[in-house]
Swiss-Prot record:
Protein's UniProt keywords contain Aminoacyl-tRNA synthetase: no
Induction statement: Induced by the auxin analog 2,4-D.
Keyword Isomerase: no
Chain location of the short sequence motif Nuclear localization signal per the record: 900-907
Domain of life per record: Eukaryota
InterPro entries tied to this protein: WD40/YVTN_repeat-like_dom_sf, WD40_repeat_CS, WD40_repeat_dom_sf, WD40_rpt, WDHD1/CFT4_beta-prop_2nd, WDHD1/CFT4_hel
Biased composition (Acidic residues): 349-359
Major location category of this protein: nucleus
Stated name of the protein: Protein ENHANCER OF LHP1 1
Provenance organism: Arabidopsis thaliana (Mouse-ear cress)
Subcellular location: Nucleus
Bias-annotated ranges (Polar residues): 853-877, 944-953
GO cellular component, one term: nucleus
Amino acid sequence: MKSRSLKLREAHKVGGSAAFCSILWDHKAEHFVTSSSSDPSISVHDGLSTSTLPPTILRHHQDGVTSLALSNDSTLLASGSIDHCVKLYKFPSGEFQTNITRFTLPIRVLAFNGSGSLLAAAGDDEGIKLINTFDGSIVRVLKGHKGPVTGLDFHPNGELLASIDTTGTVLCWELQNGVVSFTLKGVAPDTGFNTSIVNIPRWSPDGRTLAVPGLRNDVVMYDRFTGEKLFALRGDHLEAICYLTWAPNGKYIATSGLDKQVLLWDVDKKQDIDRHKFEERICCMSWKPNGNALSVIDAKGRYGVWESLVPSSMLSPTVGVPDIVPKKRNEILDFDDEVEEEIYRASESLDDAMGDSDDGESHHTSRKRLRKKTLIDEDVDDAYEELNDGSSLPSASEYRKKSHRGHREKQGARSGAFKGISASTKYKMQSSFQPGATPPEPGKRTFLCYNMLGCITTIEHEGNSRIETDFHDTGRGPRVSSMIDIYGFTMASINETGCVFANPCKGEKNMSVLMYRPFRSWASNSEWTMRFEGEEVKVVANGSGWVAAVTSLNLLRVFSEGGLQKHILSLDGPVVTAVGCKDHLAVVTHVSDCLPSNEQVMEFRVFNISKMTQELKGRVALTPGSRLTWIGFSEEGSLSSYDSEGVLRVFTSQYGGSWIPVFSTSKEKKQEENYWVVGLNTSSLYCIACKYAEMFPQVTPKPILTILDLSLPLASSDLGAASLENELILKQLRLYETQRKVDDMALVGVDTTALEDEAFDLEVSQDKCILRLISSCCSSDSFARASELMELLTLEKSMRAAITLVTKLKLPFLAEKFSSILEERLLEEASEAAVTNPALNPNGEVVTRVESKVQNPPASIQTSENTEAVMKSSATKLSAPTLLKKSKVSEGLKLGKEQTKKDKSDDAKIKEIKKLNLKNPVNNVNKEDKGQEKEVNQGEARRSSNPFLKSTV
């Protein structure tokens, strides 16, 4: 830290506690204004005089001044106060104009738009008021924050308004329709009820980024269009940042923190270049518009000017200032006339209820005269401007007729104001996106597509783009030559056979184009293109022998690999995204507008292109307030999704078709790290960890694929075995899907041997996990839970192992319970076999059974001898079913062959179970008859054709 002295002068008296003080320069650096929340007066200082001249004092408020705002041309000064009033003055004379609006609670922040025609005001009241500075009418109220608003900033072009509240939530408003462009929840520190500390957002002078105080004593930059985090400035601040301000050219930014430091940053280099330590916290700063100086004011009301803060060896903060012309009010705000008039009348009623002050506030009659005069003057000025351009505008009288038409037609419709206010909180539907694509960056290579197979990248060069296609495994795919892109493709999809590209519509002459490029073809000129008139391609996908494109007309167009137009389907809503895998195509569309809670309402449909069928349809599950960021198929073919809150879900046919959350970044995410999903399988998530809070990976250097274990968002259990519970649920899910595939394949007569082997291995692995959980339950005395786990065991030998385990742990009562569960399982198995596999006599006729039901023996401790007898009688049975297991259709197909190989009839087995001796002690359970076990194993070996009769745990 450089050693320098900065003398501060007292501008306002502050009591014992800290206050929030403000300081502003005018656009010519001739005057600066100061105020304090502990002082009802405003001081206008002479910025040109070298001597200390007394400031001009403005005394119109009844309580402390909490906020100041100057219009860009420095002709209007606005002030907000704890006395609930917003006042307007001429500047620099300080002549009072009017109480432009009132609140029911203290005001915290004010902001002018670029042209000075709108003033935004907010505070402890609900809602942000947009006030017409010409006539004082309230043109809109923006509602969406859940806490007092402490910061406001208009975008340089006047189309957007950024706001932040005490909870650290940022909302970006589109002023044309009053909807929220994006929401950044809890990204800034929570200031609570401390009114001397505020959160503030600040647009960069070029309008590309939004700077917000971060949670880690840093400044975080967000993208203007998407709200995605771009980068962060982190330096020597020891406590949270409480104020920030951009240099006029946007090359530098100054920040003040609760640690009483002011840091100067080089934004391009992302590092601090100078800092200054003060005696008190600096609560407001303002760059001098025409010099290398920064004015500061601390929490005690003392101000000073930090001269020559940017080193002379670096670019001056006044060089290269962006020249952005703000749009006129009528080009930005497209309000309904009726709503505008009703809100105006509502503001009049509020002012009538509050009463006029004694400081010279204008009456409403004078406001109307002011509005009439202003409209005429404004229209005359606009007419002269348009005449110079050779065009024309409506006359002033026509403009007045238009602005009052809604009021005349709907004289008594007072509900219109409330409808207008409610409409301002309408959230925006998510735009369409291509899975695996990154936003374009000028001069940088970006991804058009990135998946588990490979990637497609593009970079603009001399007016055209150069596209390159690479496979992660070079031996898996062919070498694809680079391509010159003359269309400006922004989306792509790749699989083993080819890749498809598309670009948006760029005017009437540049139509949206779809292009397919096969990797291998027996014929020349296999590439083909399609052009779309009057519609725009939003998303593309490809699969086995087909290419698909979804357009702005909600049309799903399916083409063959050769370019034949095969199918055209109308979708139910605007497309969000689409992805293909082999024969399947998944399409996500909007169902309706966003809910008032900012929840997206989406629907997915999975088509089988080769069969021309729709296999799945349902709603897309999302975390409340989040957006869909990725969709794809797992390696096993399960539809999967990932949202902006970091929750990965897999769609399963369980419970009639449901989404299961299999991963959440809330427990896995590291500091300053985001996960960009690429793919997944039954146990792992493949993603790219983006450092420094970047939302997308960079092409250079080549991103590294990160493998994360799937982890369900489980509740904290008293068992302390969350990893085992997570493993069990994942194995159950995988076993369920595998057995479902076995059933589906068996119904159509397809060989299922390989899948049955896989299912058996999963059963063994699942039982091992359950046995470990039983051990944990016994250690924590959770015996009821252990009994439930015993019932989930699939294989008979696993159940016997559980009995052995609890016996060794000296838990005889639990061993007795486990033994009874085993006996019930064996009886149920024999009873089911008697029903599904009836006995046949030598003539092939079904033998009628006298005993149709088997009475269960009393639940008591079983001997090893009786248990071995049961093993002997059930050696040829399939493994016992679990909650997830289904009866195998394939076994029914083999019924005739299996019936001829039975060594005993089912009647004999039932009688054998009934004759079990139940009087021996539990310790005999551990004694095994080796001869009987050998006989059982030999019996199992004879049935090796059934994969579910393999050797178990």
